[in-house]
From Swiss-Prot:
Annotated Low complexity bias: 17-26, 40-60
Protein's gene: XPT1
Protein keywords: Carbohydrate metabolism, Glycoprotein, Glycosyltransferase, Golgi apparatus, Manganese, Membrane, Transferase, Transmembrane, Transmembrane helix, Xylose metabolism
Sample GO molecular function, one term: glycosyltransferase activity
Taxonomic source organism: Cryptococcus gattii serotype B (strain WM276 / ATCC MYA-4071) (Filobasidiella gattii)
Membrane topology qualifier: Single-pass type I membrane protein
Family annotation (Pfam families): Stealth_CR3, Stealth_CR4
Protein name, entry field: 3-O-alpha-D-mannopyranosyl-alpha-D-mannopyranose xylosylphosphotransferase
Similarity section: Belongs to the XPT1 family.
InterPro entries per UniProt: Stealth, Stealth_CR3, Stealth_CR4
Necessary cofactors: Mn(2+)
Cystine pairs: none
């Protein structure tokens, strides 16, 4: 079935556009070219051809052709009367109606062999639409900005998109053999990262008045230091620009916003955009305000002129009050220099050539865009069912508006973080930073994420720092993050094994939008409720949800689940040609894997030892990145790769690390009646048994299969090559899907209600009746959750006083190995002096201003080779 690709400029292309095989963004697109062996004409040759006299193109009028025309005119023309044409039209309309409504005929695309690739959304998220009004103008007042919010994403949303898959031949080599012969040509360009920041100016009187009002309404006492602003944001952004020059796509600021107060906020609307807004606000076509009539035009070139109630129509006044809002903005931000694609931007090629410069520094040629989004624009609820495909029906818009009334305004960063996946124009790979995070050394994209190894997670390996899997009532209104961590692990432990999970280091977090969307569907009830907690100190529900930690741990669990599903369901469940069943052939395969002989029928337990692995041996990773033409990591030490199975549990201090290199499989306990009574069992039941009911069995089987795969790759998990499974046929009354979610497992909030059968999984991720290469399917599934456990030299400091601040800054300056810095404002004394010391150190460390800063100097702040 051929799917069309919407143009980015289309009003419906913002969230829904996807590529067909005819789209240049599709991997199946082939551009037409000149025939082999023939050169295209040169420009001079084309010019001579155009200047040459054209040959005669008149058709030959042979006697035979004249006779045919005369016969047609003599026999057909008399019957072409209005009456016969009307009857012919009615007959065609009747035939069309019968076959369209009563006896539908399959379209040619259905009669041909449809392919799932033509229905997957593009891996790249389309750019969002422009806001109404000239959003590239600078703000009238640097503290606030009048804006028209972007609409909610078109339903169904979120639409799960594929991660960036390797090409099929590279994917096979990488997962089966642990290395690939593919180079830069096959693997493509290195990914660019997006970066996100949450920001609020706690000294803004408008924001403070709102916070005090809601604090009294909710009867809470929120610490003031959570909202103090020490000018950290601008330097945090500078540090990321300096650490990753040329490797960043978009910076996103998530900002607080307010309702539009009329007429006080009129002065924040740029005077130059009033004519365009009048057209938007006018409901009748052609209706015009008297100001726009000939003879009375004001001068709109004066950007400093203020808008007054007398200068706008009643319809525009109503439009601004009902549709527009005010967003809080950093005073140093010049909105006219946010987008390098704007010809007026200093780093746009047009501006560079106009200035007479011969070339650009690579960091300027690939300078990131800066986007902003308000809380109003990111606070939405899912409009799609948990299958990731079916649109939720009912009074959805009304329900979302009622929920927004409970959730906004919000003063809870955890609630805001849970909505990051709704940021318009967000890339798939994201660095999420607090405004007090700083990068101190050069980094590569691969220090955070890559298609080969996945996302880089920096866990805290302290056993006593692990997060408990239960809601603790005394921590529900905790002003810190403990309550949010416990709640996050509690909901994770309903869907995955119930256990302690490691905390993460206080550093920037790597998240993917695809996984954020999965979590938004899987845990939508818990996240929807927790997002209504305006303050962390509130007692609503079961507490906050620490979204960044949830996503980090979810990646680890989804990888483990996908590994076991690949072996249990896709491999062992299809080994005898049947689908979703473990039988005698499965028992034989398991015995062969463990080397059973005829005399081993009484064996009950098997001790498994972790085999030697080369995945993280010195130089191997660097070689893989060099072969791909991508930068190797610069500031990270890697401890574990998901390509070696699943991360071993943390050990108490003093315990022998070797105990994580062996395990015991109790065949009777792990396989149940399938082994003890030799009964056949559904593979989906065995999946739940090994993965969730007895998780130690699943973990030990993973160790055994990784060892069986050899020193590299995961070949023992996968079904044999050329293994295909037929997806379920189209249900009566259902139509072909307009888009397909990528390979993924159920998004249910508990494992008990999940259906892991091949039929169910393929019913939503493959076309009806499609022959699915299940081996490639599993590799694409695993690509979605790849990860590395790593550590960087990072420092985290809570500044207490001026003397403490001086010691901290000296310690950092004396240690050039520190790559990541977190610095919390916990000032107890010498507040003004600490603030001065902070800003002096910031300016000393990152003097080069970003192009979107108001005081940016085109000479002093340029990049120099």
């Amino acid at each position: 079935m051929l799917s069309t690709a919407l143009s980015p400029s289309s009003p419906h292309a913002d969230y829904n556009s996807y590529s067909s095989s005819l789209s240049p963004t599709s991997p199946r697109f082939h551009a037409s070219s000149a025939p082999h062996g023939r050169r295209s004409p040169s420009p001079s040759r084309l010019e001579s051809l155009l200047d040459a006299p054209l040959p005669s193109c008149r058709p030959s009028r042979s006697p035979r052709s004249r006779k045919i025309r005369d016969a047609l005119a003599r026999h057909i023309r008399p019957h072409l009367t209005p009456r016969t044409l009307t009857m012919l039209f009615l007959w065609m309309l009747s035939v069309w109606s019968i076959h369209h409504f009563f006896l539908p005929i399959s379209s040619l695309s259905r009669l041909s062999n449809p392919r799932a690739e033509e229905h997957f959304l593009s891996t790249a998220f389309p750019p969002p639409p422009q806001r109404i009004g000239d959003d590239h103008l600078d703000s009238v007042d640097p503290r606030w900005r009048a804006y028209h919010p972007l609409p909610a994403p078109d339903p169904p949303f979120p639409r799960l998109r594929p991660t960036r898959f390797l090409p099929p031949q590279c994917l096979e080599q990488w997962f089966a053999e642990g290395e690939t012969l593919c180079g830069a040509k096959e693997l493509g360009e290195e990914e660019k990262l997006d970066a996100t920041w949450l920001w609020v100016n706690g000294s803004d009187h408008r924001w403070r008045d709102s916070m005090i009002e809601w604090r009294e309404k909710e009867n809470v006492n929120s610490p003031e230091r959570h909202f103090r602003e020490q000018n950290e944001l601008v330097h945090s952004m500078r540090s990321v620009l300096d650490a990753l020059p040329g490797h960043l796509r978009t910076f996103h600021l998530i900002l607080a916003d307010y309702t539009f107060n009329y007429p006080e906020d009129l002065e924040l609307v740029p005077f130059s955009i009033i004519p365009d807004l009048e057209k938007v606000a006018s409901k009748s076509k052609g209706r015009r305000h008297p100001r726009d009539l000939p003879g009375t035009p004001p001068s709109f070139s004066n950007l400093t002129e203020r808008v007054t109630p007398e200068s706008i129509s009643a319809s525009l006044a109503s439009h601004l009050q009902s549709e527009w809002r005010i967003v809080q903005t950093p005073t140093w931000l010049d909105f006219s220099r946010r987008d390098p694609s704007d010809p007026s931007h200093p780093f746009h090629p047009y501006s560079v050539s106009k200035a007479g410069e011969r070339g650009q520094h690579y960091a300027e040629a690939s300078y990131p865009t800066l986007r902003y989004a308000s809380h109003w624009e990111v606070f939405h609820t899912p409009s799609v069912d948990r299958d990731g495909r079916q649109e939720l029906m009912g009074e959805r818009e009304w329900r979302e508006n009622e929920w927004k009334k409970k959730a906004l305004p919000t003063f809870n960063s955890m609630a805001i973080e849970s909505r990051i996946g709704w940021l318009p124009g967000l890339a798939d790979a994201i660095i999420a930073l607090n405004d007090d995070f700083f990068l101190l050394r050069p980094h590569a994209v691969s220090d955070f994420h890559s298609p080969l190894y996945g996302s880089v997670i920096r866990f805290d390996h302290g056993y006593n720092q692990q997060v408990r899997p239960e809601v603790v009532k005394s921590h529900i209104n905790d002003p810190g993050e403990i309550g949010g961590l416990y709640h996050a692990n509690a909901i994770l432990s309903q869907r995955f094994p119930h256990r302690l999970r490691p905390y993460f280091a206080h550093v920037p977090k790597v998240i993917t939008r695809g996984l954020h969307h999965e979590a938004s569907l899987m845990f939508k009830e818990a996240l929807t409720e927790s997002s209504t907690r305006r303050f962390r100190e509130m007692k609503i529900g079961e507490g906050d949800v620490q979204m960044q930690w949830l996503l980090t741990s979810l990646r680890v669990e989804r990888w483990r689940e996908a590994l076991l599903w690949t072996w249990v369901v896709a491999n062992m469940g299809t080994i005898s040609g049947s689908q979703d069943r473990w039988d005698d052939a499965t028992r034989t395969a398991i015995k062969d894997m463990f080397g059973f002989t005829e005399n081993d029928n009484d064996v009950v337990k098997i001790e498994v030892h972790r085999g030697e692995r080369w995945t993280l041996e010195p130089g191997r990773m660097q070689k893989a990145f060099e072969q791909a033409g991508w930068e190797a990591p610069k500031a990270t030490e890697f401890l574990f790769s998901s390509m070696d199975g699943t991360m071993p549990p943390l050990l108490k201090h003093g315990e022998d690390p070797a105990q994580n290199d062996r395990c015991m499989i109790d065949l009777n306990r792990c396989f149940g009646v399938f082994w003890t009574r030799e009964e056949d069992i559904l593979s989906t039941d065995m999946m739940k048994r090994l993965t969730f009911q007895y998780p130690e069995c699943g973990d030990c089987m993973i160790m055994a299969l990784v060892t069986a795969s050899g020193t590299l790759g995961l070949n023992a998990f996968f079904p044999p090559k050329e293994t295909t499974v037929t997806a379920p046929e189209l249900a009566p009354g259902d139509g072909y899907p307009k888009f397909l979610p990528p390979p993924h497992l159920p998004l249910t909030p508990t494992w008990h209600e999940a259906d892991f059968s091949l039929a169910n999984i393929l019913s939503t991720t493959a076309l009806p009746g499609e022959q699915v290469d299940i081996r490639q399917y599993c590799m694409r599934l695993l690509s979605r959750y790849l990860y590395l456990d790593a550590r960087s030299v990072s420092h985290f400091h809570m500044l207490k006083s001026a003397e403490h601040a001086q010691r901290v800054f000296k310690m950092i300056q004396d240690n050039p190995r520190v790559s990541i810095l977190g610095m919390n404002d916990d000032i107890e004394s010498d507040y003004d002096e600490v603030k001065r010391l902070m800003n002096e150190w910031f300016e000393m460390r990152w003097p080069r201003k970003a192009v979107w800063e108001r005081e940016w100097d085109p000479v002093k702040d340029r990049y120099i080779d």
